[in-house]
């Protein structure tokens, strides 16, 4: 290990010591380093970094206290001797090959450049199935539609099918329109957030406005056409902002859910926010009582906010009364986290919930009781998300940690098993926001979904992590969107509800993609193509509506408010081969 790696290792340890032996590590920079170095480190073991530090010979302050008595004279290691004498001990790092997957010596597994090398004692990292193949030669990597049963035309054998054909399919065009892939990077806001981006949402009426949340609880509003018009609200939540929904009757009112256990409503015009629900009124009393909120959706018919916590309970909020209705209802295994909620767009009383108890469940919110789910959809591992199709609500799309995207074509049919399972790389580690496959809200055929990819690909010597557009009816990969200027992973992706635009969140940055036209393709062949980026956040608002000057220093997340710092505009140019440079 070279001196650069050793210096970073020592710096991380020193920073942890200053904050105290029991403080959680500040992984702001560690997250971005993890993403940028994902092509050179294994992703299978989440705790390898700490394990390597302990095995390197460095001992924490508490480790030297417990030692069993022995009849023989105790041998004192150089590290312990140096600690007792107050001197700094040298760090010894072993160069022996150790597999981070099976912990055995003699071989290694993980990313080598842009190629993932499998552990010979484990199944394929992509499909999780034994079969003598590796991730590089996995048939699902060669062709994503491998083993997928395409959707077939339904036979109208029952009266319910006749109703479905006439009322629903009659509104869907028989000829599938050409889908425009937003595959050209239009602009980006570099390091807009101080922590990694966790959620994105387009404004329901202002086409050019994008809202984003991050791990620190900060809410950002950005006009990506005017580039420099952006506002951040830094006092809405105190930690991870997991979900946000607009009020259907007031497009200036936004509801947000956070891991601090609160639901807040923010007036985007005035910047004034108010708390609707607080599941931790007594503050932090340990992880056994601390409740976090991940899933949230809005029932527009009844004006209800549906909120699910990390203990498996569902809470109903009346937005008009700003009060909780009834008692919490257990909808998933007690003590398990509910990861997402989604109301059916055609029948809002039908609710789809997903959890880390390996199930997605369908409920009738008019008759909510424990163990009263219509059906429980079993999965192999944690279910990151579940969504009804955006037009008819008759399909279900789920994303599971077993590297499977599951599709149910008809919610009134047999739901014992999915209509198809699509193998896709989205099994992530602790430094990433969970991947979630989402429908394209503009697609009337209800077949197109978008999701980021974890395993990197080698594009002209650069390790890139594409954003995949998938045909859920066949499992076919429609397009993989990437740019040589973006080498980090993009787990958060949102398609515009009206325009052919894709927004992606990668680390602390946000990017906007648009379809590449024929004129753009001709222009790119003749000359270099320029893209505009904006660095740093601009105006910042507190929850009381007052503006505050922002700082672009993300080391401590503080802002001095003394001098307004303008966002820096950078123009990136790159050739067809992907070798880029920046001009300020």
Swiss-Prot record:
Extent of Basic and acidic residues compositional bias: 517-532
Presence of the UniProt keyword Glycoprotein in the record: no
Source organism of this protein record: Oryza sativa subsp. japonica
Reported function: Required for DNA repair. Binds to DDB1 to form the UV-damaged DNA-binding protein complex (the UV-DDB complex). The UV-DDB complex may recognize UV-induced DNA damage and recruit proteins of the nucleotide excision repair pathway (the NER pathway) to initiate DNA repair. May function as the substrate recognition module for a DCX (DDB1-CUL4-X-box) E3 ubiquitin-protein ligase complex.
Record's protein name: DNA damage-binding protein 2
Assembly with partners or alone: Component of the UV-DDB complex, which is composed of DDB1 and DDB2.
Gene Ontology cellular component list: Cul4-RING E3 ubiquitin ligase complex; nucleus
GO biological process: DNA repair; response to UV
This protein's encoding gene: DDB2
InterPro entries: DDB2, WD40/YVTN_repeat-like_dom_sf, WD40_repeat_CS, WD40_repeat_dom_sf, WD40_rpt
Compartments, record wording: Nucleus
